[in-house]
Each structure stands twice: as C-alpha cells, then as structure tokens.
UniProtKB/Swiss-Prot annotation:
Gene name, Swiss-Prot/TrEMBL: rpmA
Compositional bias per record (Polar residues), positions renumbered to this chain: 1-13
PANTHER family named among the record's database cross-references: LARGE RIBOSOMAL SUBUNIT PROTEIN BL27M, RIBOSOMAL PROTEIN L27
This protein's record includes keyword Electron transport: no
Originating species: Corynebacterium efficiens (strain DSM 44549 / YS-314 / AJ 12310 / JCM 11189 / NBRC 100395)
GO molecular-function terms, A-Z: structural constituent of ribosome
Record keywords: Ribonucleoprotein, Ribosomal protein
InterPro entries: Ribosomal_bL27, Ribosomal_bL27_CS
NCBIfam families registered for this protein in UniProt: L27 (TIGR00062)
Short name of any one Pfam family annotated for the protein: Ribosomal_L27
Protein name from the UniProt record: Large ribosomal subunit protein bL27
Single GO biological process annotation from the record: translation
Lineage top rank: taxon: Bacteria
GO cellular component, one term: cytosolic large ribosomal subunit
Length: 88
C-alpha cells in the first residue's frame, strides 16, 4: 500500500449515469397498449383509467387511446381515453 498518492491522482471524478426519467408521452398524444407513459422514482404521477404501474413505478398504457393528465384529490393522474369506435 502506498503511503502517498501517485502524481496527479484524485479522489473525485465519479458520478452516476443519468436514468432518463420523466414523461415520455404527453397529453393528447395517441398511444398503443404497452407503451411507457412516465418513468419515475416514487409516484409523482399516479395511474388512472387504463394505465398500469410497474414495479419501479413506471406508468404504462393498458389500452390504445389518447393520453390525458388530470388532478384528483391533489394527485396528478395519468389516464388513457379510448378512441371511439368508428363504424365503417
């Protein structure tokens, strides 16, 4: 074990990799079932209608439709509003 550090060494210079968290699909955007809507740590956004929550609190679409953000009891909710079926 050296009693002195080598020339030009430093105990600094480390940082964790960015986790790419945040909202991935915004209000009004069309999404398919399974698409990730929000990546988060903790429940900053809560799952609403047709939205599921993963083990790491990621919110994802359960059905195809449009993304809608709302507030309910001071909680930010993410919902999926299903598209109306058009008869052809």
């Amino acid at each position: 074990m050296a009693t002195k550090k080598g020339a030009s060494s430093s105990s600094n210079g480390r940082d964790s990799e960015a986790k790419r968290l945040g909202v991935k699909r915004f209000g009004g955007q069309q999404v398919n079932a399974g698409e990730i809507l929000v990546r988060q740590r903790g429940t900053k956004f809560h799952p609403g209608e047709n939205v599921g929550r993963g083990g790491d609190d990621t919110l994802f679409a359960l059905k195809t439709g449009a993304v809608q953000f709302s507030t309910k009891r001071n909680r930010r909710m993410v919902n999926i509003v299903e598209n109306e079926a058009v008869d052809a």
